[in-house]
Curated annotation (Swiss-Prot):
Species of the source: Arabidopsis lyrata subsp. lyrata (Lyre-leaved rock-cress)
One Pfam family in the UniProt entry: CASP_dom
Record lineage: Eukaryota, Viridiplantae, Streptophyta, Embryophyta, Tracheophyta
Transmembrane segments: 9-29, 52-72, 81-101, 130-150
Keywords tagged on the record: Cell membrane, Membrane, Transmembrane, Transmembrane helix
Protein name (database record): CASP-like protein 1C2
Bilayer topology: Multi-pass membrane protein
Keyword check for Magnesium: no
Major localization class: membrane
Entries under InterPro entries matching the protein: CASP/CASPL, CASP_dom, CASPL
Amino acid sequence: MVKLTQRLGGLVLRFAAFCAALGAVIAMITSRERSSFFVISLVAKYSDLAAFKYFVIANAIVTVYSFLVLFLPKESLLWKFVVVLDLMVTMLLTSSLSAAVAVAQVGKRGNANAGWLPICGQVPRFCDQITGALIAGLVALVLYVFLLIFSIHHVVDPFLLRKS
């Protein structure tokens, strides 16, 4: 019964992480807004910024990985390798979220020292959608941290309980 509960808990966490990463990808990809000021037209889209592209690619990789691991049989020897992959995915999510948040912060507040003006006043819907994508990415990251702890415990625990 305990093994079934552990397996089910891991699957629920993985499915939630899959949904969060997929939501982050969808929210980021669909973020686009056009704004005009007299004769000047501004089009804001995620693909204009490398950090946002990286965020989309990283979360897409996490989405595919999460989906594939959901169907991994519980008897498979690959579960020991899943711990390593979970660690890599957690690091990938951390780096992509950090880069995207840094760029979003500059977009929201600007940088007076560099002479960069904030754009969220001109394209608020775009900025709100980016914020939603970043929140979904943060949720995916937190879930993957829990999954990493869960995976380490699941793989290492039998070795700790073994009698010598």
